[in-house]
Amino acid sequence: MSKPIVLSGVQPSGELSIGNYLGALRQWQQMQDDYDCQYCVVDLHAVTVRQDPKALHEATLDALAICLAVGVDPKKSTLFVQSHVPEHAQLGWLLNCYTQMGELSRMTQFKDKSARYANDVNVGLFDYPVLMAADILLYGAHQVPVGSDQKQHLELARDIATRFNNIYSPESPIFTVPEPYIPTVNARVMSLQDATKKMSKSDDNRKNVITLLEEPKSIIKKINKAQTDTETPPSIRHDVENKAGIANLMGLYSAATGMSFEEIEAKYKGVEMYGPFKKDVGEAVVAMLEPIQEEYRRIRADRAFMDEVMKQGAEKASARAAETLKKAYEAVGFVARP
């Protein structure tokens, strides 16, 4: 019996954060035995915001090495760089012709990013969700892991797929209509200084973010200064509404140690201050990231190995993507190249 297909991507813009790991990359490693996984470094998406060429080049290789370091196995999964598979851009153009301007103008992420990058509101930024739809539909993905900020984009991909199928092939759909992948454990990491907001790798205030490749001393320093509260006497309990900072630190500690919130609350019952708890959180996070960082450094230094991973990944991805693109081209009446 064939496995359900999953598509997920990571953007090589800025340093990947612990939120990227706990919210996505760790799931990638865990899903490989049960799903037919297509994992992508989405460099085409990255250039919707102006990038320094050298920085983008290095960030793409960094992201690929991190994917491998966290346990993505190229023998089990297809791991590739988006721009190495031209079918993404080709299908993206075709899907543009089946997407309404009004649908894109309602995307909240476009509104947020266009406000942030007001001096460079380009067409690519506006059209980002259509390229994302192409990413998903090319591989017949049954499920797509999405965060709250991407739910709208997945809904659009579903709408485009359904629209195209209904026009050209209602009895034998060309595109699989994807469903969201809901993880069994929701690891949402919040900003260290404002735990009401999601941790973002692009946050200008770097005190809010822990990166995957961050030095241990820096990690511990940031967690020691992370938001808590002024409750007297202090208490360690998971109460997102009233103790967002502590709840966020408990989430990190749970993810790093495997302890449940109940076990953490019992361990720190009757604490007189938050300092010892923060110290333990910092040490646990460092211990979780150290083997990933060591493996990353080993892989990043082996360019020949990385080139082979990229080559094989692109070949596998292109073979599958070309089949879908061929069906879509035939459906709309394009003449096949002799």
Swiss-Prot record:
What Pfam families does the database record attribute to this sequence?
tRNA-synt_1b
Question: Where in the chain are disulfide-linked cysteines found?
Answer: none
CDD domains according to UniProt: TrpRS_core (cd00806)
| E.C. no | 6.1.1.2
For biological process, the GO terms are: tryptophanyl-tRNA aminoacylation
Q: Where does L-tryptophan bind?
A: 135
- The entry marks the following residues as binding ATP, namely 11-13, 19-20, 147-149, 189, 198-202
Q: Which GO terms describe its cellular component?
A: cytosol
For the motif 'KMSKS' region, what are the positions? 198-202
Its localization reads: Cytoplasm
* Superkingdom field: Bacteria
Key words, A-Z: Aminoacyl-tRNA synthetase, ATP-binding, Cytoplasm, Ligase, Nucleotide-binding, Protein biosynthesis
Q: Which InterPro entries match?
A: aa-tRNA-synth_Ic (IPR002305), Rossmann-like_a/b/a_fold (IPR014729), Trp-tRNA-ligase (IPR002306), Trp-tRNA-ligase_bac-type (IPR024109), Trp-tRNA_synthetase (IPR050203)
Q: Which GO terms describe its molecular function?
A: ATP binding; tryptophan-tRNA ligase activity
Where is the motif 'HIGH' region annotated in this sequence?
Answer: 12-20
Q: What class of enzyme is it?
A: ligase
Per the record, what are the reactions this protein catalyses? tRNA(Trp) + L-tryptophan + ATP = L-tryptophyl-tRNA(Trp) + AMP + diphosphate + H(+)
Q: How does it assemble?
A: Homodimer.
The family annotation for this protein states: Belongs to the class-I aminoacyl-tRNA synthetase family.
Quote the function comment for this protein: Catalyzes the attachment of tryptophan to tRNA(Trp).
Q: What is this protein called?
A: Tryptophan--tRNA ligase
The record lists the organism as: Vibrio parahaemolyticus serotype O3:K6 (strain RIMD 2210633)
